[in-house]
């Protein structure tokens, strides 16, 4: 056992030391401490300890006496433990992150003077933190929620924090409403229920009463709110920023991140189950992908509107509850981000990282977006509450460029500032402000005129047009998922006033949608609407418009289900091909001890059928073998694996005798299987009944109608889900 532990520790150490480095990672290495056999236990003040098991006490041969308060070692250990926790983030408490790099491949010098967006030879270190919004730090990953997508760029000119979400709009236009929208979404105050959910009275009461939230809650009820992976979701800056170029010209901009792997989501039943079966699903998925070298990547894009064109649209471009439709303002992709290194320790890096929307570099600025103006105060203020006034001196927050100013003192000050002056101007002319030529930050000379008032422009008062645009732009399956989501959420609202009024609000999006939901949740069905659906659509709102450039199974998890007597030829070929395509084969057996193949070879499964679930994989494959198929056909959990994977619309592959096993488990006449030596695909179920020696020897080509079994099966996996099963109602015909 000690040898196994030693090997595990060595493997973890090698993973960290072999991971890609960067200027920021090198900076952090000064803070590293290695925990290994050569080290000896000490106090925080460096004195070596002889034991960590016994408090200093009065003892005799036959009894234990009182513990002594004089023991400094014991008191330090307890005191340190008692004070380990820092204030939890009010929102975005549940998070995970990674290091990486950012590079522009097309200079945006026409828009900005910021080298991070113009210098194509530069590679900028980044740390990215993904998060849910409503849940506490210990809540589940797969809840229905907005996901935070925050990027800290460690540029040579200072830190730039792009603090966004996986949804491009927000619930409110003005930051003054932030306490209300979050209070309404958090657990209800009288009983602290529910955790990390929007399916309750207060959330939906706020949505009805605050009509500007209508666009955002349609996104929150879409598949965007239950991503398959953090690596498979878009990111958006949400707010309207500005870019200023070297000629002093300003553009309004929105920032976009688009994943290389495409935009994919869980299905709702799967998300619900995973919240209990594997509450760390997203966190582990990101870690596993990076550890396996399947580094997630995103394209970085900019939407830009010239200052003189600010008022040319029927919406206000400073309104955070509105998108800039891409058919009106195309996204220009100029760069790429790759995450390639896991954190060395969660707390001092992922937990203590502090993002501030106010952290920008020269060439990037702020618009008058009223939500952004308030965020610039709120984010900075909350970091002081969580981490103290010197939070930017923490290693993870520390810039990689020189930092010099006359800020002094405060709790947990790390910097030792030498010299005899701590002010400017001073007699030495020490640390003077930088000139523009030296890279000093240039504020745009914006002319402002008006009256002081608590008011918004007329365009800010239109709240339904883009909610309709989003709903209209969904594919049929995405619309059905939104209907199901509204039905689930409002079913959990006990107050008839809440779900009754929300049905009426949905009529402002689409009358048919409202009538369908009314029947599901028991509200009065509206017959008219004050805001008829305008019928317009736009591009790149549906997730179906973001497939990978080529079909791929990269980083997908494929379960191979075996039992004694399995076909080792099919197993070996599938395992090798899955690995070769950068996917992750997971062997599942009736037990975790070794399973014997038909030829006498053995393999030890990664998990057993009861210890793992189909929810945790993207596809399942069952190789043939008469004895194995018979064993699995009598195993209720094995049959449930097949049925659940089918119900969740996942690719299912089977060869040889396992074909009949799959047919028995699904038992639907619409789903047909192979009966000869030809590969057959039906609703994403790929089968090959009669296996020939050459069945697995051909090179695997991932394509529709591929000649080989594995090519066809991998293509089914690459489609993410077989939506036809749901559109044709097959998924609801079996129990899972």
Curated annotation (Swiss-Prot):
Active from pH 4 to 12. It catalyses: 2 H2O2 = O2 + 2 H2O. Gene3D superfamilies: 1.20.1370.20, 3.40.50.880, Catalase core domain. One of its GO terms (cellular component) is ascospore wall. There is a cross-link at residues 356-379 (3-(S-cysteinyl)-tyrosine (Cys-Tyr)). It holds the Pfam family DJ-1_PfpI. InterPro entries: Catalase, Catalase_AS, Catalase_clade2, Catalase_clade2_helical, Catalase_core, Catalase_haem_BS, Catalase_immune_responsive, Catalase_large_C. GO terms for molecular function: catalase activity; heme binding; metal ion binding. Induction: During prestationary growth. By ethanol and in the presence of air by heat shock. Inactivated by isopropanol and 20 mM 3-amino-1,2,4-triazole. The active site is at 92, 165. Keywords: Cell wall, Glycoprotein, Heme, Hydrogen peroxide, Iron, Metal-binding, Oxidoreductase, Peroxidase, Secreted, Thioether bond. Residues 1-29 are annotated as: Disordered. Glycosylated; with alpha-glucose and/or alpha-mannose. The keyword Glycoprotein applies. The keyword Zinc does not apply. It is found in: Secreted, Cell wall. Belongs to the catalase family. Occurs in almost all aerobically respiring organisms and serves to protect cells from the toxic effects of hydrogen peroxide. Homotetramer. This is Catalase-1. It comes from Neurospora crassa (strain ATCC 24698 / 74-OR23-1A / CBS 708.71 / DSM 1257 / FGSC 987).
